[in-house]
A protein has these predicted regions:
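Positively charged, low-complexity terminal tracts
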Residues: 1-142
Length: 142
């Protein structure tokens, strides 16, 4: 199971995965292409459900002038989140997910917004800088 929600008030994207969802997410990263659909999550009034996650490999030039290798773009109009990563970012995400897969079944991924403005950013697009993994109790994923 995978749930992904976006909170405009606190500016964060939260991904909740159980083991099956984690394996789907890892397989998506390994393929370096494609989309992963998310079911509508239980939301409060300040949460927006995000329907799909698309992982897009990009060249290192996309991140020139920055000190990171993973970007996450949220499109308000299409309710889509896109992860962009170069080779180093791809390795970082694989390492994190492999570590979590070995140590626990349930977790959520919290992506913190950055003020970095990319060339692709519009009024409907937000840029997220970093992805951090936190353990999550089993009751979170049903």
């Amino acid at each position: 199971m995978c749930n992904l929600s976006y909170s405009p008030n606190s500016n964060y994207v939260e991904i909740t995965l159980d083991r099956k969802g984690l394996l789907q997410f890892m397989e998506l990263l390994r393929s370096k292409k494609g989309k992963l659909n998310f079911p509508l999550s239980n939301t409060t009034s300040d949460m927006i459900s995000v329907r799909c996650l698309e992982v897009i490999p990009v060249s290192t030039e996309t991140f020139s002038g920055t000190d990171y290798h993973i970007m996450c773009l949220y499109d308000l109009k299409s309710s889509t989140v896109q992860f962009l990563f170069d080779v180093d970012g791809f390795s970082e995400m694989q390492y994190i997910l492999n570590f979590i897969n070995e140590t626990g079944d349930h977790f959520h991924m919290f992506a913190d917004f950055d003020l970095f403005i990319s060339k692709e950013e519009t009024d409907e697009m937000s840029v997220i800088k970093a992805v951090t993994i936190y353990p999550q109790v089993e009751s979170t994923c049903r």
